[in-house]
Structures are given as structure tokens and as C-alpha cells.
Design a protein with these regions (language model features):
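Active-site beta-strand/loop architecture of penicillin-binding DD-peptidases
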Residues: 1-16, 22-109
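Short, highly charged C-terminal tails/helix-capping segments
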Residues: 109-121
Length: 121
């Protein structure tokens, strides 16, 4: 596959600036996601950023999660977007399943899929 798309512009960041961004993404997963969450139970360190996007006040927010792994030497990026997915935790949970499939498939055997249908703020 060859794409003819060309970036419109780029952002020049120093290596230390990139390191801070990547460290923040790792800390978001390791420090701000439950230790019992699948994404923190698999045999790979994931770095990521959650987010939501509001379409209007009468429908649930869209759930977003962008990520990469392994944190120490990235091989893959997983991005999950769930239209009207309520909260970014749902997109993060889905990404955790993808990483488990890739790096620790035995974790999927006992997975309890419940979802989190809480409304975002």
C-alpha cells in the first residue's frame, strides 16, 4: 500500500520533549488506570492517552484512546474510537484486549467483559 497523503506541517520537538510526552503517556496508564484493569495485568507496558469528544448534550460522548507498546521499545500503536462510547475508559478497555491478544493471550481466557457505561463529565 502506498499513500499519496503528505503531512501539511510538522512539529519539531527535542528528544527530551518527546521523552516527557512518552513518560506522561506511560504514567497515564500505570498511575491513573486501576491496577486490576486488563491493560495493567498483561505482560507488556502500554503508554496511552484517553479522551472524549462531545457531539451534543443529548447523546453520550465519543470514547477515545491512543496508545503504543511496549513502552520501552515501541512496536505497535493501538487507537480505539467508540462512537457514543460514554467514557474513554471503555476505549482503553478495548485497547487492553487488543494488547492482551498480541502479548498475553491467556489473559483473555478469564476476562470479564462488563463495560463502563458511566457518563463522562
Amino acid at each position: 500500500y502506498k499513500s499519496d497523503n503528505v503531512p501539511k506541517n510538522t512539529v519539531d520537538l527535542t528528544d527530551s520533549q518527546w521523552a516527557v510526552i512518552k513518560q506522561g503517556m506511560r504514567q497515564m496508564v500505570s498511575d491513573h488506570t486501576s491496577p486490576s484493569a486488563l491493560i495493567n495485568q498483561i505482560n507488556v507496558n502500554v503508554a496511552g492517552k484517553t479522551g472524549t469528544a462531545e457531539e451534543d448534550t443529548t447523546r453520550p460522548d465519543h470514547a477515545l484512546f491512543v496508545s503504543f507498546a511496549p513502552y520501552e521499545n515501541p512496536e505497535v500503536s493501538v487507537t480505539c474510537v467508540i462512537p457514543h462510547g460514554y467514557t474513554s475508559g471503555n476505549a482503553e478497555e478495548l485497547a487492553g484486549m487488543v494488547y492482551a491478544y498480541m502479548y498475553d493471550p491467556d489473559k483473555l481466557d478469564t476476562l470479564d467483559i462488563t463495560g463502563n457505561n458511566q457518563m463522562s463529565d
